[in-house]
């Protein structure tokens, strides 16, 4: 007699369909398509956890660059001037200073300009 393994198979398939809850169309109903969609979503999630860090760094650099150009200096010369002056502030903090504390940021620009 053939053993179908009903409850075990059903539980395994239900697990994948539960993970695909909220997906559009047959991806939330059909086992095979749901499993493919979930695995692909995990791939995207892994990739984008890395990508979001790069995106934030780009955002901070563009904010710093815009603020520095108002003072007539390029981003690369500003960063180089800070390094020569032994000022180690990360780009996130520089971006926050440029937005929230423009006076302090302009002092940093002056220091970077003097060190060249």
UniProtKB/Swiss-Prot annotation:
GO terms for molecular function: rRNA binding; structural constituent of ribosome. Keywords: Ribonucleoprotein, Ribosomal protein, RNA-binding, rRNA-binding. Coiled coil: none annotated. GO terms for cellular component: ribonucleoprotein complex; ribosome. Disulfide bonds: none annotated. PROSITE patterns: RIBOSOMAL_L20. GO terms for biological process: ribosomal large subunit assembly; translation. Belongs to the bacterial ribosomal protein bL20 family. Binds directly to 23S ribosomal RNA and is necessary for the in vitro assembly process of the 50S ribosomal subunit. It is not involved in the protein synthesizing functions of that subunit. HAMAP family: Ribosomal_bL20 (MF_00382). NCBIfam families: rplT_bact (TIGR01032). PANTHER family: 39S RIBOSOMAL PROTEIN L20. This is Large ribosomal subunit protein bL20.
């Amino acid at each position: 007699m053939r053993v179908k393994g009903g409850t075990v198979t059903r539980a395994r398939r239900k697990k994948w369909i539960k993970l695909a809850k909220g997906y559009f169309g047959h991806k939330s109903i059909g086992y095979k398509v749901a499993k493919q969609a979930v695995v692909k979503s995990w791939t995207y999630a892994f990739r984008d956890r890395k990508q979001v860090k790069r995106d934030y760094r780009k955002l901070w650099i563009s904010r710093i660059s815009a603020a520095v150009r108002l003072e007539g200096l390029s981003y690369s010369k500003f960063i180089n001037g800070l390094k020569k002056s032994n000022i180690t502030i990360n780009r996130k903090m520089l971006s926050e200073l440029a937005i929230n504390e423009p006076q302090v940021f302009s002092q940093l620009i002056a220091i970077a300009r003097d060190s060249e």
